[in-house]
Amino acid sequence: AVCVSLLGAANIPPHPLNLINFMEMIRYTIPCEKTWGEYADYGCYCGAGGSGRPIDALDRCCYVHDNCYGEAEKIPGCNPKTKTYSYKLTKRTIICYGAAGTCGRIVCDCDRTAALCFGNSEYIEGHKNIDTKRHCR
């Protein structure tokens, strides 16, 4: 199937630079009928913040991604949300470039792992926009 992105035609506010890379990875791995935005407020961890126990496999992808970013932030001067990096989308996978252990490579690996996890996890409509105060303790 061929997916056509209308992202460029949408009225979308600017995002931190790294999120553009991450969004592209997500679009590459998820089913065509989904948009990256549908993953932005899902479960207890997909989107801003996070608390409690992940509610399913997809939410666990976001939980692991949050923790991965936390590890990257331990590198002096490394801000995962703004750090850009080099990568290639090819043959149903994602290749990260750069020296192992550098901020850019670690952040790319975090995003790559999460995007591939999204593509392999079931999206449950009822877990979108949940009441996090009630379900994420």
Curated annotation (Swiss-Prot):
Coiled coil: none
Residues of the propeptide: 10-17
Active site: H65, D111
Molecular function per GO: calcium ion binding; calcium-dependent phospholipase A2 activity; phospholipid binding; toxin activity
SUPFAM superfamilies: Phospholipase A2, PLA2 (SSF48619)
Record keywords, A-Z: Calcium, Disulfide bond, Hydrolase, Lipid degradation, Lipid metabolism, Metal-binding, Neurotoxin, Presynaptic neurotoxin, Secreted, Signal, Toxin
Cysteines engaged in disulfide bonds, as pairs: C44-C136, C46-C62, C61-C117, C68-C110, C78-C103, C96-C108
Cofactor entry: Ca(2+)
Record protein name field: Basic phospholipase A2 beta-bungarotoxin A7 chain
Organism of this sequence: Bungarus multicinctus
Higher taxonomy: Eukaryota, Metazoa, Chordata, Craniata, Vertebrata
